Amino acid sequence: HWLALHGSSGGKAARVGDSKRRRMVKTSHHDTLGGFFLSHPPIRKIRVDVVDTSHPLTKGLPESFEVIDEPYMIEIQHPSETQLLLTAELGPDDSALDTGFVYDKDTALLPDGKTRVLGYIRRVGKGGVTYIALGHCHSPASQNRLSAAATTGDRPAVLRNTWESEAYIQLLRNAIEWGVG
């Protein structure tokens, strides 16, 4: 079983015309992963909803928890082979037109028009992939991307909020235990 985190849903970015904008390019690893990164809005506070608290991967997690993270917009590649673990009501992408990556249609929204997938399991043969979109970290070099909505005071020089969350640490422990068990 493969455990994939945050940035593994990305890959190649192609320049769009003469602009500085880029568009993500699907490759064969997205088929195996079962997810494709379209773009991301700015870093913000996110309420993560646990879809199934009885699954071994979500054992011990609350029904929801909050983190400050970069909300990846993940297009699910094989919905019929995918079990959702984590979601968030983030709604349509409200990023300014000059930020993020270019995409034709927001295919990362679930049918309700407001929910996005932040974690899932995809069965592949006798194994599978667990993907968790959470886990963004940043340093002073990228601090300007921190959304004002995410802070209540001074902006931190280093952001690793998700990695300091008890729920996220439990999720990673569960994923490792489940993957090797």
Predicted regions and their residues:
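Catalytic beta-strand/loop cores that center a nucleophilic Ser/Cys/Thr
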Residues: G17-A133
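Extracellular ligand-binding/catalytic regions of CAZymes and related secreted enzymes
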Residues: D94, F101-G181
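Residue-level detector of flexible, active-site-proximal loop/helix-junction positions
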Residues: S9, G91, H136
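Glycine-centered secondary-structure boundary/capping sites
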Residues: A4, L33-G35, G181
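Helix-loop-strand module that forms the ligand-binding subsite of alpha/beta enzymes
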Residues: H1-A13
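Residues at secondary-structure transition points
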Residues: A13, G17, P41, S139-A141
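Amphipathic alpha-helical interaction segments
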Residues: G10-G11, K45, M73, S80, ...
